[in-house]
Structures are given as structure tokens and as C-alpha cells.
């Protein structure tokens, strides 16, 4: 009997076992329903039933905005990977390596240059999956370089913010990115180019205290958590109970902190319309989203290099 239970049965189970992908199903944080991952991915990571907006990676975000899902990656400057030789439970350099392997990104922000309904734009996207989208030297350089390119190309700059705040492993060098990015935003304003911010879930800490709240137009995704300090910290400090929905996108819109709350499916036409209005450009023919990209990899362009618009069929 032991031979049957200990040897034969496990072998049969192994023969019949099928490998199941870990992310085959997604549980909605709002309703608790299980949804097929492919359905959520096809729906721009919005849960079909509850309309809950899941976090969206940088590459997926750029694909959803640029014409024909095609753009040029903006080459970003290298920075010292671990200036403070920081270590907690794990070395900082090892954390960066793990984050790069997991996300296939160099750091928390990816910058692209391309066309949005025929008009040239520069877009920066923070990816929360890369160390919580934290603002460090590399992320600060990415924002500054993107703004410089927007000035050079005389095009709008759009940033999708998603961050837990400044990167503690870089100390004061991380906090220094707050004034640096603020100065760069002012440089774009002096060039009379639009600066549009899309606040996604979550946008907190030093990012909220710098470039994420300086937009000519402030847009938020539904249900996004937006604030500087956490609600619990605020309650403990002021010794008062905060109102329901405090720091959520809808609450901030009601109190004038953001201009509009836009569903993810409506973001692309909304951003295109705002860019046309703010640049006083005529309405252009909308590029078809059903057309497949004619180049597979995004090409590289530096901020000082003149790049053509993303190629189309």
C-alpha cells in the first residue's frame, strides 16, 4: 500500500499535472471578482465589471497613447548606481538589479517621443513596479531630459505620475530631484509649451510635492490615490478623522486640486484634444489604433539629436 501511495500516485499526478501561468487570473481589489488576465490586458488593465483601474506598466501605457503604438525611446544619461553605498536588509545595487530583471526597465521612468493624433509629443511614464516608482537620480534625469527634448522639439510634454515618493536609498541626492524637476518645468513654461500631468494610482510623497502638481492641466484616473503624506499619518498629526474618500481623485476634483478625472479609455482623445487647444493647432486626422506598428523595437534618440516622427505605414 505504501508503494502505491508513495511512488505510483505521485508519478501519475506529475504526468497529469499541467503548468498554469501565475498571472492567468487577476482578482479585482474593488469587487473581489476573478478576471481572465488577457481580458484585463485587452481592456487597458481596467477590470471590465467594476471599472477598477489596475496599475499599468510603462510600455503598455506608451502603446495606449502613441499613434500606431510606435514611438522613439529617448536616450537617458547614466547616473551613479549607488552613490551612498546604501544597504538595509539588502544591498541597494541588488535591489536595482532585481527591479531591472523584473520590469525590463533601466529605472522607474521611461520617456518616449512620437505622435499623438498626428502631433509630436514627449511622454514620460513612471512605472510603479520599479521600486514603487520612487524618484531617484535616474528618474530625475529622465524627467529633466524629457522636458529638455520637449523644449527643443517645441512640443507638449505629458507625464504619467505613479510613485511612492523619493527613493530613500539615495538620501539627499533623491530629494535634490524635486527642485531640479521643478526648474525644468519652468523652462518648458518659458518656451510656451504645454505641460500636462496625469495622476495615476498612487501618486504620493516627493513626486506630489514637485513636478506632479505643476501641470497646466491636471488629470487624474478614477480612484487614484493622490497626496503627500498618508491618511493615517495625517490623522495622527491633526488628531481628527479625515472625510471619506480623502486623497482620492474624485475628492480632489471636487475641491479644486485636479481639473478633471478621466477614464483610461478616454485618456488618448482627451490628451490629443488638450494638446491641440493649448498649442492652438488645427484638428488633425486621427491615426488608426488598429494599425500595427511598422517597427518592432522603439528606436533611440538623444535630447540633443533631431529625431523624425515615429514612422507610419
Swiss-Prot record:
Lineage: superkingdom: Bacteria
Key word Protein biosynthesis present: no
Pathway as given in its UniProt record: Lipid metabolism; malonyl-CoA biosynthesis; malonyl-CoA from acetyl-CoA: step 1/1
Residue ranges crossing the lipid bilayer per the database entry: none
One of the GO BP terms on file: malonyl-CoA biosynthetic process
Reactions catalysed, as given in the entry: N(6)-carboxybiotinyl-L-lysyl-[protein] + acetyl-CoA = N(6)-biotinyl-L-lysyl-[protein] + malonyl-CoA
Keywords per UniProt: ATP-binding, Cytoplasm, Fatty acid biosynthesis, Fatty acid metabolism, Lipid biosynthesis, Lipid metabolism, Nucleotide-binding, Transferase
GO cellular component, one term: acetate CoA-transferase complex
One Pfam family of this chain: Carboxyl_trans
CoA carboxyltransferase N-terminal domain segment(s): 24-293
Broad class of the protein's primary localization: cytoplasm
Coiled-coil segments: none
GO MF assignments: acetyl-CoA carboxylase activity; ATP binding; carboxyl- or carbamoyltransferase activity
Location relative to the cell: Cytoplasm
EC number: 2.1.3.15
Family per similarity comment: Belongs to the AccD/PCCB family.
Function: Component of the acetyl coenzyme A carboxylase (ACC) complex. Biotin carboxylase (BC) catalyzes the carboxylation of biotin on its carrier protein (BCCP) and then the CO(2) group is transferred by the transcarboxylase to acetyl-CoA to form malonyl-CoA.
Matches recorded under NCBIfam families: accD (TIGR00515)
Quaternary structure (record): Acetyl-CoA carboxylase is a heterohexamer composed of biotin carboxyl carrier protein (AccB), biotin carboxylase (AccC) and two subunits each of ACCase subunit alpha (AccA) and ACCase subunit beta (AccD).
Entry protein name: Acetyl-coenzyme A carboxylase carboxyl transferase subunit beta
UniProt source species: Bradyrhizobium diazoefficiens (strain JCM 10833 / BCRC 13528 / IAM 13628 / NBRC 14792 / USDA 110)
